[in-house]
Structure formats: structure tokens, C-alpha cells
UniProtKB/Swiss-Prot annotation:
Domain Inhibitor I9: 36-121
PANTHER family found in the cross-reference section: ALKALINE PROTEASE 1-RELATED (PTHR43806:SF58), PEPTIDASE S8 (PTHR43806)
Protein's job: Secreted subtilisin-like serine protease with keratinolytic activity that contributes to pathogenicity.
Cellular component terms (Gene Ontology): extracellular region
Record's signal peptide: 1-16
Residues annotated as the enzyme's active site: D169 (charge relay system), H201 (charge relay system), S357 (charge relay system)
Key words, A-Z: Glycoprotein, Hydrolase, Protease, Secreted, Serine protease, Signal, Virulence, Zymogen
BP-aspect Gene Ontology terms: proteolysis
Propeptide: 17-122
Organism name: Trichophyton rubrum (Athlete's foot fungus)
This protein's name: Subtilisin-like protease 2
Domain Peptidase S8 per the UniProt entry, residue ranges: 131-421
Length: 421
């Protein structure tokens, strides 16, 4: 993926093959949503100033509609559509013509005006057998057999109990047997679409976080927050969903018992990075994928968010897959190639996928796991705990990234040895 593209990060496979190189998605004018914009207001505005600004926008919009009705040339627009308030960050989306965009850009209350953009989902194909990822989580970075059925995953029996993992994605098949009734439907931002996961990506990610067989935190709850359908979405829907998650965590008093997973990536987009930063300031932990471009993740959103936990992908023998992004912004490496999890299409369906979309939920699951066994009162404490447990200097071809692989710290605790697969 290159400039302006934004997508989910599971890569396609053919049965029996290792990962092919992902084809870059070319960027063109079609990536911009015509006439749709995201407006970020300046920090420090009073409620009265924000209210007055929005009244001004609405009055200008009404005048535009009146002139349009009177026969003036131009395009009829929607005006303000949705409002977002994440901690102290105020934003809104809307439909405006070029003249209104110029007016908004000159407003003393406006920090920035960005065009809305399409996000694209990666195609996926089933590949059988992948059983190494969980064993790696408790192996202290020791290489594990790719296709062995005897890999042990050792973990504390609390296993994420009482913690909530929010999956901003394509939805989740909450009736899948892997979730044992611990998955619920939260928010669906896609108009005229059911909350059903028709693509599979969200169900796969949720299974890696909290599935009874494939999950890192086997007793955690998962919340489906649908911002993607089968193929694409826009920042409008992504921010609406992220805003809903922040509010739901806050209203439910779950800040130190909740984690957000974002297995998505696109070109750097400051409004979304700002939103992730406000979530951090609000006391909420976000885990994000580094991206699948094979490039420096500093140019990707939300990977470039400084206080999100950014996750690159590692293979079973401690090499970086060529698709995984890297760089100083990458905090940690986790299993991200040939990862088996639950899938769409049936309550027992499974699939094997690759990408930093699979790496990120390993760490989101670890966050949920650690929250259930240790008091971690802030995102800073969560990040410190996750990074303090990592094993250094194992990833080959990590470029200039911090070279730290994920580890759940089980040798510090009494452990449970489950049977898998």
C-alpha cells in the first residue's frame, strides 16, 4: 500500500506456499471521496466557540442550499454530517464544495481540513496448517517448528479474564465456538449493512486475541466495532467507530481493563494519529499493525502514532517477513506469518493468514492477558510491561527497528500447559 491507501493487513496465500510478495495498491484520484472532508478544530477552544463555529458552518451551508435551489451552479452538499470528540480532540466530517473548504481553512477555529479517503481491504485465500504462533509467545523467542502439533503455549490461568478487547475491523462472528459467548456486537458504522463479518478479517483478528484455541487471552471478552465492509471504508467511518470505542470504554469504566486493536494501515494521516494520541491521553491502550509495505512504518497511519504500540511481523525462525514494515517507530515483533484462527462462514470455520494484521492481535491479546494478572493503571504502564518482557536481538533483518520479540513472561509465574489443535 502506498500514498492515500488504507487497508486491512492479512496477506493472501495458496495452500502449501509461503507468503508471496504483496502487490502494491496503486493510488489515484479515486482514493479521495469527492466532496467529503474531515475538519479538525484547534485545541483549547471553549464549548461556546465550538458551538458558534458549527452554527456558522450550518448557516453558510444553508445559504449554499438556498442558492442551489435558486438555480445557481454548483454541487449540492450535505454540510456537517458527524461529530467526533476524543478526549480534548474535536473534529467533524461533512460534505462541502470547494468554496466552503476554502472558507473553513481560513477559519481561526480550524486546525486542518483533510479530504476523506477510501480504505481498501486485502484479498485473502485459505491455507492449511499453522500452529506455531502461540507457542512462540511463551518460548522467549526460541524458534518453533512451523507445522508441529506438539508446540506448547504456557500461560497464567487468568488468561485475560475480566478484560475487554475492542476490535475495529470488519465485524466479528460472535457466535463462533472459539469465543464461548465472550464476544458481543458493539458498533456498526456501515450504513445499510448488517453487523455480520462478511470478509473474515475481523473474526480472524478477534480469534488471535481471545479464541479458546487460537487466542492469546483465552478468557478475555471481545467487542466488535465494525468500520469496514467487504472491500473498503473511509476515515469518516473509521473515526466514528474509534470515537464510539473511546466513549464506550470510558462510560463503562474499563480504561485499565480494555485494549483496542487496529489491524489497519495506510499513508500517514495526521487527524487519525491525533485521535490515537488523544485515546492515550484519555488512559486507553491502542495496539496497531506496522503495515505490509516492507518499508519504514513512520510513513503509515496509525503505525506512526507515537504512543500506540506498533507491531511488526516475525516468522517462526526469527526472520522478518519481507512484507513487514520496520523502523524506529516499531515497538515490538510478534508472530505474523501462517497464523491459524477462526474465520467467517460458519461457527467452526478456520483459516490461516499472514500479515501484520495477525501480528498486532498477538500483542493486543498479550495486553489483555497482562491486564488480568497485574494492575496496569495507564497506557504507559501497559507499554512498559509489554516491552520489559520482550527478548532482545533475535529478529534477523530488523533494519533499524528496536529488536524486541514478544514474550508473555510465563517463567515468572505458575503456568498452565494446555493442549492445542
Amino acid at each position: 500500500m502506498q500514498l492515500l491507501n488504507f487497508g486491512l493487513l492479512l496477506l493472501p496465500f495458496v495452500a502449501g506456499d509461503l507468503a508471496p510478495q504483496p502487490e502494491p495498491l496503486l493510488v489515484g484520484p479515486s482514493d479521495i471521496v469527492p466532496g467529503q472532508y474531515l475538519v479538525t478544530l484547534k485545541e483549547g477552544l471553549t464549548s461556546a466557540q465550538i458551538r458558534d463555529h458549527k452554527k456558522w458552518v450550518s448557516s453558510v451551508h444553508r445559504a449554499n442550499l438556498d442558492s442551489f435551489a435558486a438555480g445557481a451552479r454548483g454541487v449540492e452538499t450535505e454540510g456537517i454530517m458527524k461529530h467526533f470528540h476524543i478526549h480534548d480532540l474535536n473534529m467533524y466530517s461533512g460534505g462541502f464544495d470547494e468554496k466552503r473548504v476554502e472558507d473553513l481553512s481560513r477559519s481561526p477555529y480550524v486546525k486542518s481540513v483533510h479530504p476523506d479517503q477510501h480504505f481498501y481491504l486485502a484479498k485473502t485465500v485459505t491455507q492449511r496448517q499453522a500452529r506455531w504462533g502461540l507457542g512462540y509467545m511463551s518460548s522467549k523467542g526460541k524458534p518453533v517448528p512451523l507445522h508441529s502439533t506438539l508446540v506448547d503455549y504456557s500461560y497464567d490461568d487468568k488468561a485475560g479474564e475480566g478484560v475487554w478487547a475492542y476490535v475495529l475491523d470488519t465485524g466479528i462472528n460472535v457466535n463462533h465456538v472459539e469465543f464461548e459467548g465472550r464476544a458481543i456486537l458493539g458498533h456498526n458504522a456501515i450504513p445499510n449493512k448488517s453487523h455480520t463479518d462478511e470478509f473474515g478479517h475481523g473474526t480472524c483478528v478477534a480469534g488471535i486475541i481471545a479464541g479458546k484455541t487460537y487466542g492469546v487471552a483465552k478468557k478475555a471478552n471481545v467487542v466488535s466495532a465494525k468500520a469496514f465492509d467487504t472491500g473498503s471504508s473511509t476515515y469518516n467511518y473509521i473515526l466514528e467507530t474509534y470515537d464510539w470505542i473511546i466513549r464506550n470504554i470510558t462510560d463503562s469504566n474499563r480504561k485499565n481493563k480494555a485494549v483496542i486493536n487496529l489491524s489497519i494501515s495506510g499513508a500517514k494521516y495526521q487527524p487519525f494519529d491525533d485521535a490515537a494520541e488523544r485515546a492515550f491521553k484519555a488512559g486507553i491502550t491502542t495496539v496497531v499493525a506496522a503495515g505490509n509495505d516492507g518499508k519504514d512504518a513512520k510513513n503509515n497511519t496509525p503505525a506512526s502514532s507515537p504512543n500506540a504500540i506498533t507491531v511488526g511481523a516475525v516468522r517462526w525462525e526469527n526472520t522478518r517477513p519481507s512484507f513487514s514494515n520496520y523502523g524506529k517507530i516499531v515497538d515490538i515483533w510478534a508472530p505474523g506469518e501462517l497464523i491459524k484462527s477462526c474465520w467467517k462462514g460458519g461457527n467452526n470455520a478456520t483459516s490461516t493468514q499472514s500479515g501484520t494484521s495477525a501480528a498486532s492481535p498477538h500483542v493486543a491479546g498479550l495486553v489483555a492477558y497482562l491486564m488480568s494478572i497485574k494492575n496496569l493503571p495507564s497506557p504507559s504502564a501497559v507499554t512498559a510491561r509489554v516491552l520489559n518482557l520482550t527478548i532482545p536481538n533475535l529478529v534477523k533483518d530488523a533494519k533499524d527497528s528496536p529488536n524486541r520479540v514478544v514474550y508473555n513472561g510465563i517463567q515468572e509465574r505458575k503456568c498452565k500447559l494446555p493442549k492445542y489443535y
